[in-house]
Amino acid sequence: MAPKKLSCLRSLLLPLSLTLLLPQADTRSFVVDRGHDRFLLDGAPFRYVSGSLHYFRVPRVLWADRLLKMRWSGLNAIQFYVPWNYHEPQPGVYNFNGSRDLIAFLNEAALANLLVILRPGPYICAEWEMGGLPSWLLRKPEIHLRTSDPDFLAAVDSWFKVLLPKIYPWLYHNGGNIISIQVENEYGSYRACDFSYMRHLAGLFRALLGEKILLFTTDGPEGLKCGSLRGLYTTVDFGPADNMTKIFTLLRKYEPHGPLVNSEYYTGWLDYWGQNHSTRSVSAVTKGLENMLKLGASVNMYMFHGGTNFGYWNGADKKGRFLPITTSYDYDAPISEAGDPTPKLFALRDVISKFQEVPLGPLPPPSPKMMLGPVTLHLVGHLLAFLDLLCPRGPIHSILPMTFEAVKQDHGFMLYRTYMTHTIFEPTPFWVPNNGVHDRAYVMVDGVFQGVVERNMRDKLFLTGKLGSKLDILVENMGRLSFGSNSSDFKGLLKPPILGQTILTQWMMFPLKIDNLVKWWFPLQLPKWPYPQAPSGPTFYSKTFPILGSVGDTFLYLPGWTKGQVWINGFNLGRYWTKQGPQQTLYVPRFLLFPRGALNKITLLELEDVPLQPQVQFLDKPILNSTSTLHRTHINSLSADTLSASEPMELSGH
């Protein structure tokens, strides 16, 4: 959409958002009409066709763009979670600023003429770190999450007494745009089946929000038994490959009267590192939607726009083995990770138009894309060389290794250090018993990288060393479990490592603040560190480069690199794992880049091995499946100091 047209549309929608907040709330209602199996909005029959978008996966400056595209697609509502850990990073410390400004997002939804279906948890899944629960809950190691454990309920009550009053003015009957609120999330898939816990939550919602707001639950068909609760409207979730008739028939056993609701109709699926990129065919998704709409059902499409797991926010599953989720949350959704309409969107819009009016006019085109590079990175230094800056308070000492949670390290990395108590001449097995590495350990002896020990593997490393040799183990938290009957997912070294027949003790733990180093120290002129002859293991690389023209959205491609973390101008883009796949590029929104000759800085923490030429490129198309062949556009080997982004920039789309 051209900027002028976008501005006009927003000005037309502005009166609606203001109207939503006017004190005429007593005439507004959203209720279940059980006699006619439907919803009523202000007394009139109503059916929502909704889509999921997560504000915490989309930078704030892009909220309006994504929401307007959803409205133009024919949706009349959006559904989204509220991740507790995103807003209460430490007990009693709350953050609702910037991209965490929930009220601003509700207002943007109102500007786009979208009603809201809110899912505040406390547990959300969402393939998000620890399912949205804050990891500081695990500082009490015996806590039972998602149960009526008094410690857990006390933390939930404290959080909801902050959150729910904020959203109270935005309830539909109060003049806002929130028509319904979900209690918990797919609780029937959890092992506890604690109805006392669910009743406590329902009572808390009612006490803080009143009796008028519609409260509901969502579960897969197998979870309805433990997930539903009297007094909460029961909904179900399933995808296009599932038997709609069978599932809705089962739903009627729990909710005999009222509208049929699929709260998560899957337009795609998530990706795990090491597995193929997931897709769902356009024909299957559109056919399933049309069949549900013919039944009069209300439907939310999960996801309509997936977004990105920036930083360390991805979650993980455990299906026989630990499965961390990729940085991209594209989800094969109707709106791509970069915010572009896909063929799936146009097909879904055609289906929706058969059942309700859709906004007139063409959908906005794809955003401009940019190509740049290759950019040659310079070696900054080994991670161990910056230890004083990474952990300015110094180490924590303990006989046995301590977990991330015990030392209050929520995300990222922690270094464990001990010293060899005797000389080892022959290669000697090193391992951590009982799968006690959560999640990946990068092992070094006197600064020399030895290899990796990880959560899913039983392989051992073989080490040698002298009396007093320094044994360093950098442990990476790859994301806490986010779904299902998961137990508490502690991170770090859960068991003391063993070298030969010796249990290693006398540990120092260094909780690392890598983001602070990248953001505040690396822009300064740091002293020169001695470079290793053949760098391997956890090492920083960096490069400043100008973009001479205007900027566009782009995708960072790291051919030959192994695994690590990337920052652009101090912003943590997230993890790359080129060697594992399927994701090969990282989405870089254009607002992160400085145009017209200003210097940009890219920083990599490569954890294992670097390519012979430490180069990266910025592409105009993503590569989300490593098994697919990249259509390579010829890139001239110009240095980043002279390449103008305005020349190779072109629109990418359909």
Curated annotation (Swiss-Prot):
Claim: Secreted is one of the keywords in the record? yes
Record Pfam families: BetaGal_ABD_1, BetaGal_gal-bd, Glyco_hydro_35
Give an example GO molecular function: beta-galactosidase activity
Instruction: Tell me what organism the protein belongs to.
Output: Homo sapiens
State the Gene3D superfamilies in the record. Galactose-binding domain-like (2.60.120.260), Glycosidases (3.20.20.80)
Q: Which EC number(s) does the record attach to this protein? A: 3.2.1.-
Q: Which UniProt keywords apply?
A: Glycoprotein, Glycosidase, Hydrolase, Secreted, Signal
The protein's name in its UniProt record: Beta-galactosidase-1-like protein
- Glycosylation site positions: N97, N243
| GO BP, one annotated term | galactose catabolic process
Write down the InterPro entries for this protein, in alphabetical order.
B-gal_1-like, BetaGal1-like_ABD1, BetaGal_gal-bd, Galactose-bd-like_sf, Gly_Hdrlase_35_cat, Glycoside_Hdrlase_35, Glycoside_hydrolase_SF
Entry's localization field: Secreted
Q: What does this protein do?
A: Probable glycosyl hydrolase.
* Family (UniProt): Belongs to the glycosyl hydrolase 35 family.
Signal peptide coordinates = 1-27
Which residues constitute the catalytic centre?
A: E186, E264
Cellular component aspect of the GO annotation: extracellular region; vacuole
